[in-house]
Regions:
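Extended, loop-rich substrate-binding clefts of extracytoplasmic carbohydrate-active enzymes
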Residues: 155-249, 263
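Short, solvent-exposed, Trp/other aromatic-anchored flexible loops in extracytoplasmic proteins
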Residues: 307-343, 357-369, 447-482
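Acidic (Asp/Glu-rich), glycine- and aromatic
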Residues: 247-297
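Beta-strand-rich N-terminal accessory domains
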Residues: 63-183, 376, 381-382
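Long, low-complexity serine/threonine/glycine- and acidic-rich segments characteristic of extracellular
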Residues: 399-508
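Beta-strand-rich recognition/accessory modules
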Residues: 69, 73-108, 115-117, 317-399
Length: 508
């Protein structure tokens, strides 16, 4: 079962949309997280060496006093990530009445598992050799690690049909029974699982592609009817993609993507991106009742919500939190790549509501018609100290990502006139700078300070949004008439360096 504070969701409209450079398709092949390395253009740069010889710098042939140079092809910005910790293998197994698929860590010490008959939701994260070490609540189609989306104008049955909930919520009760538009990864309130369209190995990741179901099959009814659970669930015209990948022995990267095929847009509101339900002692698994922020402080979860649940909003000093057992030596952490430090915890006390614990980051965004939306989060296994150390290390290894939009291809320059470059970059913390190199030498720098709402609509919640863009002017005074390689680099405060794009510039 799922718990959501209803009637308090933001109503600001989301009007920006991404473009092909903001959310490009993944390159084919296994190494989907590799840096750009292939060549798209070969021309010649001045070396001072004689024609008919080879360049003393590059070893390439000299033609008209210019050595061959090339620029690497652009890559999908979403592939700009650290390499995985390795691949421990994928296995499938029947667990009770369910079909699950598991990805092992490189040493096979830790395992993460997804349920194929519940929309590929994460239902296991624990020790490979101990099935009773599971830190994830796998109670039903609404309680796992999963995605769920909302629309403030269609938040409740009765008013959802006319998209009028922002002005009047109507007469249906403030309960998850009467949720409106709400594609849920796991399935619906009848415990019918969402279908997994495909699953398998992509690079070192386990990929699952899902068509979510409306949580409430009666979501668009004009009244408060409740139809009996019979027949199939109601699929939504969006797809969820989840990729699970070990980036450290104890840390799984959770890569999520939503692609809408709808013709309607959904305004900005709070989303579950994702929500982590943790084990509650059922089935011999550990009970993890202690929620801690990154400083080890337990936030209050005592505000009454709907359906007898309690919640609490809080801020963590770092962008991660953890649910632990009573001795704080075993549990699971959730970190947000976007740098989000605001969280919301939920619980049921076993009296007014079933006994459960969950947490999610406080993130709000809209879903445009035909939009693509991407996000990253991380799960870490262990005691409080292990979780913190592992998540901090993963965050420091995560570098910037972005794209060079201008120029989109090879550049024709006029000697003495500056080159104009523009693009965007995001990172998991502030302080990232842009550097432009020409033939390997620094030629210009820039701040990331331009509004790029289109970028932040695809990658919502990242530090600095909506100011994700940069513009830079590169002087060409003193350049030779030969072609030059222009490389745009993002450097962050952790020392990570990422090439955003390369272009060949040739005199016109």
């Amino acid at each position: 079962m799922r718990w959501l504070l209803l009637g308090t969701l933001g109503l600001a409209a989301c009007t920006a949309s991404g473009d092909g450079d903001v959310a490009a398709s993944d390159a084919a092949g296994d190494d989907v997280f590799a840096d750009a390395s292939s060549s798209d253009t070969s021309v010649f740069a001045d070396t001072g060496d004689a024609d008919g010889t080879t360049s003393s710098d590059t070893g390439l042939p000299i033609v008209d006093g210019c050595a061959a140079v090339s620029a690497a092809d652009d890559v999908d910005p979403w592939s700009m990530r650290p390499k995985s910790a390795g691949f421990g293998g994928i296995t499938e197994a029947t667990v009770g009445t369910h079909k699950d698929v598991f990805l092992d860590s490189p040493t096979k010490y830790v395992r993460v598992g997804a349920r194929l008959d519940w929309g590929g939701t994460v239902v296991f994260f624990g020790l490979t050799a101990n099935p009773k070490s599971n830190t994830i609540d796998a109670n039903d189609t609404g309680r796992e690690l999963q995605l769920a989306l909302y629309d403030p104008t269609r938040i409740r049955q009765g008013c959802a049909v006319t998209a009028s909930c922002a002005t009047s919520l109507g007469s249906c009760a403030n309960s998850i029974t009467y949720l409106g538009w709400n594609p849920v990864q796991g399935g619906d309130e009848c415990n019918r699982g969402a279908p997994v369209l495909s699953h398998g190995k992509v690079g070192d990741a386990l990929e699952l592609v899902i068509q979510p179901l409306q949580w409430n099959p009666d979501w668009d009814a004009p009244d408060c009817r409740t139809t009996a659970c019979s027949g199939a669930g109601r699929p939504v015209d969006v797809t969820y993609r989840m990729r699970l990948r070990f980036v450290r022995e104890h840390v799984v990267e959770v890569d999520t993507e939503v692609v809408s095929k709808e013709t309607i847009s959904h305004p900005t509101t709070a989303q579950e991106w994702p929500t982590l339900y943790v084990s509650n002692g059922a089935g011999g698994n550990p009970d993890l009742p202690v929620l801690l922020d990154s400083a080890g402080t337990a936030p209050s979860i005592g505000t009454p919500g709907n359906d007898g649940f309690y919640y609490g909003n809080f801020t963590s000093p770092a962008p991660w939190v953890t649910w632990q057992n009573s001795t704080k030596d075993y549990g699971v952490g959730l970190a947000m790549d976007q740098g989000i430090k605001a969280f919301q915890g939920w619980r049921g006390d076993g009296s007014k509501a079933p006994y459960f614990h969950n947490v999610r980051a406080s993130i709000a965004f809209g879903i445009g018609a035909g939009a693509t939306i991407r996000g990253l989060s991380y799960l870490a296994l262990g005691g409080f100290g292990t979780v913190g150390g592992e998540l901090d290390a993963a965050a420091k290894a995560r570098g910037p990502f972005g794209h060079v939009d201008v120029a989109a291809g090879p550049i024709v320059f006029t000697k003495g006139s500056p080159l104009k470059l523009a693009g965007w970059a995001l990172d998991n913390r502030s302080g990232t700078k842009i550097e432009v190199q020409v033939d390997g030498a620094i030629a210009a720098t820039a701040a990331i300070d331009k509004d790029r709402g289109d970028v932040c609509a695809v990658y919502p919640g990242y530090v600095g949004c909506p100011k994700a863009g940069f513009e830079v002017s590169v002087p060409t005074t003193g350049w030779s008439g030969c072609p030059h390689v222009v490389r745009v680099i993002a450097k962050d405060s952790d020392g990570n360096v990422q090439v955003l794009g390369e272009r060949v510039a040739q005199a016109g």
